[in-house]
């Protein structure tokens, strides 16, 4: 029997012992060494050969990942590890660190109970480290820390024990500050989740040279830091690897400090599921009952050239097996499971069944998308997975060959299914399709994959930035009349408080939650009681309030009112860009008593026009997306680096020394950051490393508004002059 077959059999045996299971993700900033570390763990578990670990990048299975040397998709793998005389099953997800692929990280966190955060010893905690930590903590996932590339401190920077200790203590302090800040507000975490060397929740080492240490491992092997420095300086890295192998240190830490599903699910279920806490389904999920109803959350959709579409996700209760007919949230009817498997590196191994507490890879769930709830009974779905950043950049994609058009449309729909952070707009009439993503690299990778994997040659347009529109002050009351003049709506618009907008973005307030809970949350964020109890609907980050009293026929017309409102908010009055952060109030309405005279053709335009006019009266402005920029650069290039930010309508917020480099931090509009990578390289002779992170939207400068609005209107084929405001006042 082959070694791999043996591992699969052992995994199958351990799947039924939830106490022995650990579901974990490895997450970090780009290039801090996650994938190299993952390869080491696979080698330690006997999944790939020890010699090639670190070069193999077994988890980077796509051609573009190996070419670019970064992880783009989150990859899954199951392996076994013996700890304290007991074998453990470790289901691991390696996630991307590049900011453009943060959606994969968010989804991975839903499937796991522990996150191993990897930080580069030389660079320290970076912007994306903070983002992945925040995503983990928000999903109720417990962190531990591995500080990688310690070999560089010893060999390159020639640091002695004191300097090293100071630097490493600094990294641990930064990470703990983030953990403390996030967990203080969490009622369901009653233990201290900060990491420390003494507890064994921090490990150090070098993924490249395959050695690692932690407090427990030093006690076990009798090695101390002084000896490690000696061996590393004397280039005896093989001896270091043999005496204190990285995979043992990290996997021991995983088994000791991360919760198993039995401990984790009772705490995590209330955080990610808002159904009836006393129901049988709730009990089965909290007890990880493999005999209960099946409940699985899909976190990832992938394509296998042989098996077709594969839905991977966490089984919270019940057991999934071939032939089951399962409900998929948000769709009618059921899907039949064709096959069930687990991941071993890039390969999927078919197994008979996967019980609660494990990560399964299933075919046959044709209606599932990343984020779907799959279950054997109809039930309240899981909370939607909140992605920290929204799409900010758009490209048009056309098939070079008209014959490829149907295949291109199908491929784009598939892309949107696999990666919910991508938005696709398909225009059947023009054949031009818009695809919006997190950044230039995100869209570049998607279009390359369409060409390479599907063999469809495409033309792509220049990148276009996504804008928003938002009211700046309270409007006067505006009347909206239906075309037949028999129906009137009286509406005002005002800006919504920033705290409330943020709460909606984070998913802490939605129309899916019980009304009382929603009202309390809104009042906590500063909304007054009367307004909070009259919320009719929430659309994106806009709230619609029904302040009317006893208006005849309004109840049966409300659905059309909401439809008109949503149309107005999806295409704002300035440039048909989405409106955000608006509080819309309906004060009064006059409706025709005969239903035939207050149908969709009358109500929808009346409301749409009233909302647009109220927005114009509320001084609506264009918002543009911005990015936080961090550039690390040698001293002599500091001026060039800050010049690159300032020359892009940006602002430099801070400059400071870190090690032998200067750090320049600032913000700049995404629109101006297109093409930044090649410019910064030439400005600093290739000596800079940099990072950008999407930081939401801000009001665009007044002097740039008219020109930008004209450009967008022209691009969309709209009339150049803005709609005139009807004079009601």
UniProtKB/Swiss-Prot annotation:
PROSITE patterns referenced in this protein's UniProt entry, alphabetically: G_TR_1, G_TR_2
GO cellular component, one term: cytosol
GO molecular function: GTP binding; GTPase activity; translation elongation factor activity
Keywords, sorted A to Z: Cytoplasm, Elongation factor, GTP-binding, Nucleotide-binding, Protein biosynthesis
SUPFAM superfamilies on file: EF-G C-terminal domain-like (SSF54980), P-loop containing nucleoside triphosphate hydrolases (SSF52540), Ribosomal protein S5 domain 2-like (SSF54211), Translation proteins (SSF50447)
UniProt superkingdom: Archaea
Binding site for GTP: 28-35, 94-98, 148-151
Subcellular localization, as worded in the UniProt entry: Cytoplasm
Domain tr-type G as annotated: residue spans: 19-262
Pfam family, one: EFG_III
Keyword RNA-binding: no
Keyword Protein biosynthesis assigned: yes
Positions carrying Diphthamide: 597
Family assignment from sequence similarity: Belongs to the TRAFAC class translation factor GTPase superfamily. Classic translation factor GTPase family. EF-G/EF-2 subfamily.
NCBIfam families assigned: aEF-2 (TIGR00490), small_GTP (TIGR00231)
Task of the protein: Catalyzes the GTP-dependent ribosomal translocation step during translation elongation. During this step, the ribosome changes from the pre-translocational (PRE) to the post-translocational (POST) state as the newly formed A-site-bound peptidyl-tRNA and P-site-bound deacylated tRNA move to the P and E sites, respectively. Catalyzes the coordinated movement of the two tRNA molecules, the mRNA and conformational changes in the ribosome.
Protein's name in the database: Elongation factor 2
Protein species of origin: Natronomonas pharaonis (strain ATCC 35678 / DSM 2160 / CIP 103997 / JCM 8858 / NBRC 14720 / NCIMB 2260 / Gabara) (Halobacterium pharaonis)
